[in-house]
Amino acid sequence: MECAVIGAGVSGLTCALRLLEKGHLVTIYSNKFSPNTVSDVAAAIWYPFLSYPIKKTNRWSLETYSELYKISLNSPESGVTIRKGREFLRDKISPPDWTKGINGFRILEKNELVNDYIFGWEFEAPVIQMNLYMPWINDKLIKMGCRFNEVNLEYFSEINEDIIINCVGLGARELCNDIEVKPIRGQVIYIQQDPGIGRFDQQPETLTYTIPRNDVTVLGGTAQINDWSMEIRDEDTEDILNKCESLWPELDRNNIIGFSVGLRPSRYEVRLEKEYFLDKLIIHNYGHGGSGVTLSWGCADEVMKILESN
């Protein structure tokens, strides 16, 4: 069947790849392609964050975890590696359910905690170097015959294909008239210094992370709802550095080499469902919040299940 995918971020590319693997003809429609999508500036580590409903996103996240783990073993050129990470908390809580399905999970000993953190855990997680991962997926799509159409769509009726996979992200505000879609602004810092392991405080109000990739370490972050600014803010930079130094006292500010800003496509819950419109089957797949990469393969497989059942 001829299928259209709207959106060329990681969600759209992953859905396109799954469609091609099943023998469908695929065209991706987008007004932005890599390296100009928000996915290209993702930190990016596998970690469920700012995405709902929890039960579904946990399942999609673990399915993605498994796929990324296999990619790290079989395709090192993809930029996916497995690193240890540590989550630090100021309160003792029950670990999330997803921790039961990942490798290397353990509760930290008291002597492994830093500063005034009182609880935490260690785990193994895929770290994705997006400036390698996005071209890697794109190359696979090209080799499989995917077509690309750079266009600014206003209406679904502009698409000829009868099957549409809608991965438009923030663009759903206009294309779908979905006012529940809101940006969550994220600013990060790039530094040439390796902390050895990833360190996180993923509570939304104190969002802090140091993510060691093969090329740089990414420091973050911010989670500013309904903030559309793409400017680098000095006050955010200072706040990020102060927070990261509490997790990583050895951080050396002299090693900073750059900054970036992206707008996460947030929604009260991921919209992954079918809709019929003008005799077209539309499968919506957007609103992944801060977990676009983390949910990508699980959501793509869910899209395929919906398509195959129709």
Go through the PLM ranges and name each one:
Residues 124-206, 215, 225-228, 235-243:
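Predominantly flavin-linked oxidoreductase catalytic cores and closely associated redox partners
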Residues 136, 254-310:
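C-terminal catalytic lobe of FAD-dependent flavoproteins
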